[in-house]
Each structure stands twice: as structure tokens, then as C-alpha cells.
Amino acid sequence: MTTYITDKDGKSIDASTVSKIPSDRHFRNAWTLSGTVISEDMATAKTIFKDKIREVRKPLLEAQDVLFMKAMEDGDSTEQSTIASKKKELRDAPATSAITNAKTIAELKAAWDTDLLGASPYA
């Protein structure tokens, strides 16, 4: 039985004939085939990375919304300001320069902000 690998553009190759393949499957949907070499398309990998940030930040933003409402009820404008800043950081997370400037998959993985988003899914 032959196993085929299909890249992001729908090109397929017999897995036994591949000469180089990415070390992990984190960005599997960014794989691109050139001859017998499979590499990762950085533009597609960045999109996947940003989508993962959006997925992770959603519950974090929802939690901040709850805290903000409590601060509003308490009339705590200092806490409201702190929470608003945190929410802005979360909203801006997919647009950081570390992601934009990443030239390699390793640099892209290193762009995960563990202080803001928690443990990296790429560790």
C-alpha cells in the first residue's frame, strides 16, 4: 500500500520518495512540494499561526470582559483601564512585528507570546 502526501496546493507525492520533510506537523497545511522536497510556505504558516492566536485569545478576551463588567459595577476606573489595556494587547497579538518579520518556522514559533497567551502550542 502506497502512502501519498498532499501539499497545500493539492500536489501529491509518494511518501517513500520524499527526500526532505518538515520536522513536525504544526504547519502541515502550509506544506508545499517542490520535486521530492516538502517545505513550509511562510505566508501560509503565518496565517495558520495567527488563526491559532485568535483561537487561544477568544476565551481570554471573554474572561477580561467579565472582569471589566465587574470593575464597572464597582466603579473602579483604574481596574477598567488596566483591563482595557490587556484586551488591546490580546486584540493586537496577531499583528505583532515578530510574526511579520519571521523568516523561518523557528522564528515564527518563537513569536508566541507566552506572557500574554499562555503556553505555546508549538513548544
Where are these regions (language model features)?
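A preference for well-ordered globular domain cores
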Residues: M1-A123
